[in-house]
Amino acid sequence: MICSLASNLKDLTQFPKAEIEALWCPWRVEYFEQETPNPDFLSEAARSSDDAAHLVVTRRKNAFLMMNRYPYSVGHLMAVPYRKTGDASSLGENEVLELWNLAVHGQRLLRETMKAQGFNVGLNLGQCAGAGVPDHLHLHIVPRWNGDTNFMPVLAGTRMLSEGLRGLYDKLIATQERIEKNNAP
């Protein structure tokens, strides 16, 4: 079908283009209004003691779990090593283990808080692979739901975010406190 459609076109500029409509995402306006985006926000979050300001959900010895401040999918978390590196092979065994344990913990938080039914978990290593912060790797934990690719993104090219960052942050912290209380000796 595409081959026959393309053969009927005089040039590729006539090929139909998919357009994506924008929905207002108030938390993203900060990102676009920055004179220069802060490329070191992960290191700042690692050093800071103000977890709420940096949306840090939990801290461990070698890594921490934080919300993505500019998500396109509600609930998007990131497991981040304290040590700044863009090379996964330079991570120590304890760092790798802790990153993975934080990814598992993040999945539990999202399952219990948002009723997530599945997850995309992964790394973008290097700028050409889509890393927004290529020199400080981070493991993405993106919640998914059956039917989350509904008519809006398919037909209208639009994604909807159902909850603001601060409200979700508070819910994740409450869920984490409940989990810790239930697991206390």
Predicted feature residues:
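Active-site microenvironments that recognize anionic phosphate/pyrophosphate groups
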Residues: M1-V74, A79-V80
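C-terminal helix-cap and adjacent tail motif
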Residues: N8-E35, R144-P185
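Short connector loops/turns at beta-strand edges and beta->alpha or beta->beta junctions
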Residues: Y70-V74, Y82-T85, R144-D148
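Histidine-centered divalent-metal-coordination microenvironment in nucleic-acid enzymes
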Residues: H76, G130-N150
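Short histidine-centered catalytic/ligand-binding loop motif
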Residues: M78-W100, A156-L161
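Long, well-ordered alpha-helical scaffolding segments within enzyme catalytic domains
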Residues: G92-A116, R166, K171-I173
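A short glycine-rich, hydrophobically flanked beta-strand micro-motif that places a catalytic Asp/Glu
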Residues: M114-Q127
